[in-house]
Amino acid sequence: MPAWFYILRLKSGTLYPGATTNLEQRWRDHQSGQACRTTKLDPPVALVLHEQFETFSEARRREAQVKRWSARKKEALVSGDLASLSDLAVSHDHGGLRGR
């Protein structure tokens, strides 16, 4: 069953990532304040990005990945700024020196 990763722009300007198997219904749920507390308190104004996946678990993995990103990196993804995405990537490899 196909699934989607999506990003909403909220009224405050914040980008909100999510995943669903029914993009149209999830959008309606967010707009009506029935999807989650975040969008109930800060309603969405636009669906700014969506990516289709073969399974819901793949879409959820993408959601988890993007939720860890900085606001600047999410903005780069939404705007299609691939150069900035690369520049904003942070290496978590400490060269094996952790704890030394």
Identify the meaning behind each predicted range.
Residues 37, 64-77:
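Short arginine-rich
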Residues 1-50, 57-64, 82-100:
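GIY-YIG nuclease catalytic motif and its immediate N-terminal context
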